[in-house]
Amino acid sequence: MPLFATPFAQLDLVRQPEQDGEPLQAFDAADEYLLNQLHERGVTAQCRVLVLNDAFGALAASLAPHVQVTSSGDSHLGFLALRKNLARNGLDLGSVRFVPASETAVGPFDHVLVKVPKTLALLEEQLIRLHGQLAPGAQVVAAGMVKHLPRAAGDLLERYIGPMHASLAVKKARLLIAEAAERPQPRSPYPTRYRLEQPPLTLLNHANVFCREGLDIGTRAFLPHLPRSLGALRAADLGCGNGVLGIAYALLNPQAELALVDESYMAVQSARENWRAALGERPATFRADDGLAGQAAGSLDLVLCNPPFHQQQVVGDFLAWRMFLQARDALAAGGELWIVGNRHLGYHAKLKRLFRGVEQVAANPKFVILKAGK
């Protein structure tokens, strides 16, 4: 892979999770454009720079030796990538302060560099949280590849930050440059809530939660077929989102021990709040993690999973395959992985390569529910 070369540094960067023969770079032309623009503007060692949504740490690692850097995002994989790339390039792990997107990064900041996320609700919440955190004369610069940069991103900068103009495109990347101006204290529209009829739950969803306006159709297909009356099993909701699968399973299985795990900090926060609303002080574990990478081998009896099929703009089954591998390792002998997936993804064949037995629990024209036994 080529080095990421800017006026600030030349770095050897990797994506997270790493794949053998990874065809994709851990940076893009929008990262390069952001850093070139900041260098032209001029920075000193005293400059306080906030980086938002730095997918694999390219921005923060480049700036770490030169300015005071805070990085914030909603991906735990992004945090792991930042740490790995700092270490890989001989940089101090403490040179970048990381703040999960579920919390507010406290300034004041002189410069804010933003990679525009796929979910504009996350961008909106991040811009709202910048209120009161910008130094006088601060500039907020958002960037993305032109094909992934919606007009609405500029509208959000105008609304919450100040006057905005778009740059010319360079290497198919564009900047949206906003000058901080007085704005009234905004009211955030997040979290959102929706009502589920069965089981009867009101579910809270922070800004970056998948399908925050209503239950996704895969989970809707899965819910009626969750296993029940299984006793005191150790179970995990892998890729838990707002926690609906884990909560519904816990209601059906009062003795079960649950761990709700997601790589999104906002998802884990949503799951924690929804669990408390539905189940009070019943114990459970909530963890932002790289799937079940932090789970002891053989420590689970059941894993529930509605696997994702994209990472940022990249679509594929590599994340699902990795989750299946992690589930197999975390399950005890006789344990089961239950999943829902689109029919066309062929998860049945993939699971047969990892588990001793795979059964179809239910199906409809779009989705299939499978259980795989270890």
Swiss-Prot record:
GO terms for biological process: rRNA base methylation. One of its GO terms (molecular function) is 23S rRNA (guanine(1835)-N(2))-methyltransferase activity. Gene3D superfamilies: Vaccinia Virus protein VP39 (3.40.50.150). It is an enzyme of class 2 (transferase). It is found in: Cytoplasm. Pfam families: MTS. CDD domains: AdoMet_MTases (cd02440). Belongs to the methyltransferase superfamily. RlmG family. The lineage of its organism: Bacteria, Pseudomonadati, Pseudomonadota, Gammaproteobacteria, Pseudomonadales. Specifically methylates the guanine in position 1835 (m2G1835) of 23S rRNA. InterPro entries: DNA_methylase_N6_adenine_CS (IPR002052), rRNA_m2G-MeTrfase_RlmG (IPR017237), RsmC/RlmG (IPR046977), SAM-dependent_MTases_sf (IPR029063), Small_mtfrase_dom (IPR007848). Transmembrane segments: none annotated. Its main location: cytoplasm. Its EC number is 2.1.1.174. The keyword Transferase applies. This is Ribosomal RNA large subunit methyltransferase G.
